[in-house]
């Protein structure tokens, strides 16, 4: 019986071989991920090819540092060690490092994070803010020693001198760069004197630009209440920060141009044009009003002011005739009633009653005539008042009071500014006309 090994003895022997074999301590393996189901801590799945399958284990610390998400069917390259699990007698590979086969891990991580953030709405156009036409102060999150800040300062100074630039010195690559970029974006948003923010750096490899692909940077840009222009790398480089920013510029110079869409020269030209338009509009209005005044001066009302009250005279005559007619009609009615009552009373031989009715009738007649007379006097007084007001506008009456109408070239003169020394004037007085020549013009300053 001593020639037979127990299962546990054989398994222990094989495990010892596995653990001591240098070829199994560091194995480079290519396979396709199978039976993958994400777990909170350690990850357990299989690697397979067309002919075989091996179990794989990835501890939580390795998985968190992976940089991309494992997916079912993904082909990956792994480095690890092979070990034997004694209770089941099965072997597996303990993965210490992994990356996608064919493309880099950063590229996969980029696409996976891009998809995640896009689904969360971080890149939606509805969240984009409009850039202001005119800015007073621009914040810049970039390295203080790079060419980016120099290009921005040069371009802004050329396009719109007087715009202030506030630099937030920032580490733009390497460990801690992403956190510093995000912190400075939030710091800029705490200020109230900035109009917009430029976030960027110069060109480099995907590793150099990676800070601008980190989720914390994208989130800081998305949450910014300041409009943000991204300028990361060269024109061919695209980062997740570019997708989240309100505008993307290919170069720092282009970013500065976007930040100052209207140059100082453009603004001065615009103001000059508006000034000219305003002047022309005012002059047109003056000419229109002047033409209206001249048209009024040539109207019949000013040449024949008596026409202003002709209609009132006619209306008064009509009212007088109408009133007299009404008085006669009322009087005739009462006279007829009186005659009828007298006849009726006489037929009854009621002399006392007749006398009372006669007295009442005479009183009613007096009241009626008094009321009618009062109405007539009131309307006549209103007419005479209106007539006097209109007659006061009659130029012949004005002249009759000792005034004169002064004309030059058949136009009435209203101001000393309309005449000058040597002008010949025509004066119309109540008893004749006079031709005079101006020897001196004195203008009153307070008029």
Curated annotation (Swiss-Prot):
UniProt xrefs under InterPro entries: Exonuc_VII_L, Exonuc_VII_lsu_C, OB-fold_nuc-bd_dom
Domain of life: Bacteria
Record-annotated membrane-spanning stretches: none
Keywords for the protein's UniProt record, in alphabetical order: Cytoplasm, Exonuclease, Hydrolase, Nuclease
EC number(s) stated in the UniProt entry for this protein: 3.1.11.6
Molecular function via GO: exodeoxyribonuclease VII activity; nucleic acid binding
Major enzyme class: hydrolase
A Pfam family: Exonuc_VII_L
GO terms under biological process: DNA catabolic process
Subcellular compartments: Cytoplasm
Catalytic activity: Exonucleolytic cleavage in either 5'- to 3'- or 3'- to 5'-direction to yield nucleoside 5'-phosphates
Primary localization: cytoplasm
GO-annotated cellular components: cytoplasm; exodeoxyribonuclease VII complex
Protein family membership: Belongs to the XseA family.
Role description: Bidirectionally degrades single-stranded DNA into large acid-insoluble oligonucleotides, which are then degraded further into small acid-soluble oligonucleotides.
Subunit: Heterooligomer composed of large and small subunits.
Name the UniProt record assigns to this protein: Exodeoxyribonuclease 7 large subunit
């Amino acid at each position: 019986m001593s020639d037979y090994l127990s299962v546990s003895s054989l398994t222990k022997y094989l495990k010892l071989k596995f653990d001591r074999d240098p070829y199994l301590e560091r194995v480079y393996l290519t396979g396709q991920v199978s039976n993958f189901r994400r777990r909170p801590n350690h990850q357990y799945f299989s690697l397979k090819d067309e002919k075989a399958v091996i179990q794989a284990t990835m501890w939580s610390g390795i998985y968190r540092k992976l940089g991309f998400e494992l997916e079912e069917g993904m082909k990956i390259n792994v480095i690890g060690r092979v070990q034997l699990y004694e209770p089941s007698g099965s072997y597996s590979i303990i993965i210490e490092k992994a990356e996608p086969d064919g493309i880099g891990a950063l590229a996969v991580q980029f696409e996976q994070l891009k998809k995640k953030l896009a689904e969360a709405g971080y890149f939606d156009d509805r969240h984009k803010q409009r850039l202001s036409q005119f800015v007073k102060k621009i914040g810049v999150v970039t390295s203080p020693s790079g060419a980016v800040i120099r290009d921005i300062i040069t371009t802004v100074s050329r396009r719109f001198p007087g715009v202030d630039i506030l630099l937030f010195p920032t580490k733009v690559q390497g460990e801690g760069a992403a956190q510093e970029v995000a912190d400075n974006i939030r710091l800029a948003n705490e200020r109230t004197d900035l109009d917009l923010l430029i976030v960027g750096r110069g060109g480099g490899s995907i590793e150099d630009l990676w800070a601008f692909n980190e989720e914390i940077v994208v989130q800081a840009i998305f949450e910014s209440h300041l409009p943000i222009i991204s300028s990361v790398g060269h024109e061919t480089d695209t980062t997740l920060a570019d997708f989240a920013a309100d505008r993307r510029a290919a170069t720092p110079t282009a970013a500065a141009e976007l930040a100052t869409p209207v140059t100082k020269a453009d603004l001065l030209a615009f103001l000059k044009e508006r000034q000219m338009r305003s002047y022309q509009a005012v002059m047109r209005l003056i000419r229109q009003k002047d033409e209206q005044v001249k048209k009024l001066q040539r109207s019949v009302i000013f040449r024949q002011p008596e026409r202003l009250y002709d209609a009132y005279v006619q209306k008064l005559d009509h009212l007088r005739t109408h009133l007299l007619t009404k008085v006669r009609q009322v009087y005739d009615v009462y006279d007829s009633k009186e005659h009828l009552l007298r006849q009726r009373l006489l037929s009854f031989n009621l002399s006392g009653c007749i006398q009372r009715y006669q007295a009442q009738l005479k009183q009613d007649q007096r009241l009626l005539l008094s009321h009618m007379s009062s109405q007539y006097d009131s309307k006549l007084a209103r007419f005479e008042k209106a007539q006097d007001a209109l007659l006061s506008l009659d130029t012949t009456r004005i002249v009759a009071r000792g005034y004169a109408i002064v004309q030059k070239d058949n136009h009435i003169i209203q101001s000393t500014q309309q005449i000058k020394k040597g002008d010949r004037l025509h004066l119309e007085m109540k008893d004749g006309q006079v031709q005079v020549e101006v020897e001196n013009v004195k203008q009153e300053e307070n008029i």
